[in-house]
Structures are given as structure tokens and as C-alpha cells.
Amino acid sequence: LRLVVHGRSGGRIPACCLALADAVSTARQAPVLIEALTAETAPSSPPLQHQWLVPLLLLPGSHVRHDLPAIRQRLRGQGADVTLLPFLGAWRPWVAMLRHWLSRSMAEPSRRVVVHHPLRPGPAERYLHHLARELACPLVPADAWEVFVQRSPASHPLPLALAPNRMSELLRQAGGSAALLEDPVIRSGLIDLLVALP
């Protein structure tokens, strides 16, 4: 498996993502590589005959539409046979895990609001409408959160962020939940999903 995460500036990979890759590698008894989209240069990797490219991305933004096909082409150019899986946010079991995550929230259902990274109009917007129906709660872009909470001050923010980032930290300071991989149930469920891949 080659996991693809957003990463931080300079290609740094959050510790919770590295720990996830280690746990999956141990359970599968096979190498699990991890790559950050923010890396300035592609990581060196051992020559593997076949790789499953697993985008641990929650939304279908430009990374999903442009960067992932470029990574696949790069790996194919290195002689690997690559299978690119859909982004994590499109997996039905993952959406079920998000529903369970919401149901475990301490906030009353009417106060729950999922806050996500802002996206450009287009396919991402359609996905967000679909996800809002699936989760039965409002989804608000992070850059609109301040306005939203002024209109609905009792709202409880739940960050749609796999690893801690600026958005999740700001929301946590406002009384929101932790990033998804900081939730033991989500972390364990994602490990199980990745271990079950061929």
C-alpha cells in the first residue's frame, strides 16, 4: 500500500498518520509507504511490482482530481503496476464511520456542525451536498464558520480533518472536537479498512 496524505508544509507528515501507517504495516505484515502531497520532491521508494495507491483524502478537491493521477503516472514511469483507489471520503464504510462518529458526539444532534476545508465550486460541492444528506447535519466551510456561529451560537463544530491542522486546532479552542485520527474509534476503524484491502 502507498498511503497519500495532505501533509504539512515542507512535506512533513503528521505523527498520527505515520503511526497509522505503522499499525497497518504491522497488521498486514507488509510494507506500507506514506507520501505527503505537500512534499517538494517525491519520496524514494523501494521497487515494488504492484502498489495500491490509497488517497487518505476526505474531499474531492484539486488534489484528488490532479495530484493523484500525477502520482500514479510517476509510479508507472518507475515501472510499478499501480491501482489508484477512490479518495477515502467516497468509501461507503468510511461514511458509515463518520455517521457513528457524529452519533458519539457529546453535542445534541441539532447543534452538530461538520466544518471542512474550503473547496472550489464544482464536483466538490456536489459531494458536500451528498455528504450533508448522508450525515444529516450541516457542513460549513472553515472560512464561513465565524459567520455561521454568529447566526447559530449554540453550534458545536466537528472538524472534518483526518490529522490535526490549523482548522482543527482553532475549532478545538472554540470547544470543538479533535481531528479524526485522534479519535480511537475512528483510528481503529480506518486501520481495519486498510488492513482488509487486497
Can you say where each PLM-predicted feature lies in the sequence?
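Active-site-proximal alpha-helix that buttresses catalytic centers in soluble enzyme cores
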Residues: 1-198
